[in-house]
Amino acid sequence: MYDDSYVPGFEDSEAGSADSYTSRPSLDSDVSLEEDRESARREVESQAQQQLERAKHKPVAFAVRTNVSYCGVLDEECPVQGSGVNFEAKDFLHIKEKYSNDWWIGRLVKEGGDIAFIPSPQRLESIRLKQEQKARRSGNPSSLSDIGNRRSPPPSLAKQKQKQAEHVPPYDVVPSMRPVVLVGPSLKGYEVTDMMQKALFDFLKHRFDGRISITRVTADLSLAKRSVLNNPGKRTIIERSSARSSIAEVQSEIERIFELAKSLQLVVLDADTINHPAQLAKTSLAPIIVFVKVSSPKVLQRLIRSRGKSQMKHLTVQMMAYDKLVQCPPESFDVILDENQLEDACEHLAEYLEVYWRATHHPAPGPGLLGPPSAIPGLQNQQLLGERGEEHSPLERDSLMPSDEASESSRQAWTGSSQRSSRHLEEDYADAYQDLYQPHRQHTSGLPSANGHDPQDRLLAQDSEHNHSDRNWQRNRPWPKDSY
């Protein structure tokens, strides 16, 4: 009779006992799985650390200038915790190699900057999208309700600003060594400016012997704006309106400058057409602008008058160029040489370049810059170059690659000297600076003896033989190509 009887709760207690019994191995397996995951994570981090160490001995592949800020210490997804780079907008990074789609390996260009993990453009874009989504979810209702009460900008203007903000690339590819460009005290092509700059070129050639490349650039680098290089319509207009430089010539010069920078030597450009920092502001060169500054306009006038009647004819245009430069805010220049003595100005510039040299050269031994960015798979599709919101030209994608044509153009740039008349200065151009900054380096750069007017005249210590009768002088370069 008891076989068929039902005891309440018996089956439940048996089932409960079975569940409690079988749950113990489940907990153990969860712990074991967690340990396996932690072990795998440590193994991956160890391999990443080893790759980070090996990268110290690898050459620089390419360089970028940042357009955003980033704190690697706070990024928990960094392959090695605490090994992410920190940078602000407008900093420079040397990229060694690609670690993954989200991470590169490289270093911040500064003294003591160590090898670290650098977020790729895809990684930064992902972070930006997450931040935007988080901001939208945590939007303040009160602030949203106030939008209707505010005066909003015109839709077209708002859309334009939004489009610009959306297309800001996190990085711009730049030369691995920022080229040095001298401007001032006035216009290149006139004796005062040419000979003050020539004294500095000679000093740099000897001071940094074996570590520097000084090259003349006759093409108008101000045409190397990304908006022009990427827009065929603008190219046609520019080429029709400019007899000085074709876009192809400018592209060739940009490639040559990138090639020179691959050696990680200092690169100094004797750029005929560059007389103002604004001319290079929208290019991919990211130059070091050095302002050779005369103490006062009276000193400059005295120096120009000392050069004879030929230079006096163009006193006004030289003074206008001087005024344009001194009106620039100090942040427009990387170095301002306002010393009265040549020795002091030279040492000032040398100190800056020595610091830059140490910042760009990691103490770890290794070969020079060899690999182009094309060596990193998929890099050329990331559109690091170009003006905001525009596609990038083949030049900018390939400018870091070795080029036989670029090498040939660098040799041809030194063959023969161009004949140009200073009358270009009096012509009117639509561009705000072109009326002052036309190329006119056709003067013979003889070296004058120092006059006794001002200590700054010592920057003009050259021969006193000049021919002031011909307005269309051909400018002989004061140093040959072979001297480099």
Curated annotation (Swiss-Prot):
Tell me the compartments it is located in.
Cytoplasm
Q: Which GO terms describe its biological process?
A: calcium ion transmembrane transport via high voltage-gated calcium channel; calcium ion transport; calcium ion transport into cytosol; chemical synaptic transmission; positive regulation of high voltage-gated calcium channel activity; protein localization to plasma membrane; regulation of membrane repolarization during action potential; T cell receptor signaling pathway
Q: Which residues form the SH3 domain?
A: 59-128
Q: Where is the composition biased (Basic and acidic residues)?
A: 387-399, 463-484
Quote the biased-composition stretches of kind Polar residues, using this chain's numbering: 409-420
Q: Which UniProt keywords apply?
A: Calcium, Calcium channel, Calcium transport, Cytoplasm, Ion channel, Ion transport, Phosphoprotein, SH3 domain, Transport, Voltage-gated channel
Name positions with the PTM Phosphoserine. S152, S393
Q: Which PROSITE patterns match?
A: SH3
Region described as Mediates interaction with the alpha subunit: spans on this chain? 195-345
Which InterPro entries does this UniProt record tie to the protein? CAB1-4_N_A-dom, CACNB3_SH3, GK/Ca_channel_bsu, P-loop_NTPase, SH3-like_dom_sf, SH3_domain, VDCC_L_b3su, VDCC_L_bsu
Under Pfam families, the record lists: Guanylate_kin, VGCC_beta4Aa_N
Q: In which tissues is it expressed?
A: Expressed mostly in brain, colon and ovary.
Output the Gene Ontology terms for molecular function: calcium channel regulator activity; high voltage-gated calcium channel activity; voltage-gated calcium channel activity
From the UniProt entry, list the residue stretches annotated as the region Disordered. 1-52, 129-170, 387-484
Q: What's a GO cellular component annotated to this UniProt protein?
A: membrane
Source organism's superkingdom? Eukaryota
Q: Give the family from UniProt.
A: Belongs to the calcium channel beta subunit family.
Subunit details: Component of a calcium channel complex consisting of a pore-forming alpha subunit (CACNA1C) and the ancillary subunits CACNB3 and CACNA2D1. The channel complex contains alpha, beta, gamma and delta subunits in a 1:1:1:1 ratio. Interacts with CACNA2D4. Interacts with FASLG. Interacts with CBARP; prevents the interaction of CACNB3 with the alpha subunit CACNA1C thereby negatively regulating the activity of the corresponding calcium channel.
Q: What does this protein do?
A: Regulatory subunit of the voltage-gated calcium channel that gives rise to L-type calcium currents. Increases CACNA1B peak calcium current and shifts the voltage dependencies of channel activation and inactivation. Increases CACNA1C peak calcium current and shifts the voltage dependencies of channel activation and inactivation.
Put simply, this protein is called Voltage-dependent L-type calcium channel subunit beta-3
- Please spell out the taxonomic lineage of the organism that makes this protein: Eukaryota, Metazoa, Chordata, Craniata, Vertebrata
